[in-house]
Amino acid sequence: MSEIYSFYAMMSRIKYIHRWGLMKNTRNENLSEHSLEVSMIAHALGVINNKRFDGSINPERLAVLAMFHDVSEIITGDLPTPVKYDNRKITNAYKELEEQARLSLLKMLPDDIAEVYRSILCEDENELLLWKYVKAADTISALIKCTEELIMGNAEYSKIKQ
C-alpha cells in the first residue's frame, strides 16, 4: 500500500517545480499552476470544438491529460524551451528522459492502478488528436504568460511572444 503513497507524494511535489527559469519574471509560476491552466484551456477547446464545430472530443479526457501533461518534470525539472529544442539530438534525448521519468512514476503504483495512469501519462496512438489539443492548450498558456509579463512591463518576453 505504501507504493501508492509514493506516487501521490511525488505528484504533490509538482508545486515545487518552477517554470521560465531563464527568464526574469514579474510573477513566478510553478508547474501546478501551469497544469491547472492548461487543463482549463484544453477543456474549453474541447467544449468549443463540440458546441461550435460539431465535434465529438471528450473535454473531460482532455482536461485530465492536460492536468498530467508535464508530470515528468517532477523528476526532470523544467528544461527551458530554447535548450530543449536547440537541436534534434537534444530534443530526442530529452523526450527519452521524459518517457523514463513517466515510467519511473508509474512503477510507484500497483499494477492495477498504474494501468489507469499509464493511459494518462503516456501518449497513445489512438489519442493523438487529444494530445494535439493538449499541446495547443500548452501553447496558449505560454502565450498568456508572455502577455501578462508584457503588460507588467517585462519586455524580456517580447521575443518569445512572437
PLM features: residue spans?
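Alpha-helical, largely C-terminal catalytic domains
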Residues: 1-162
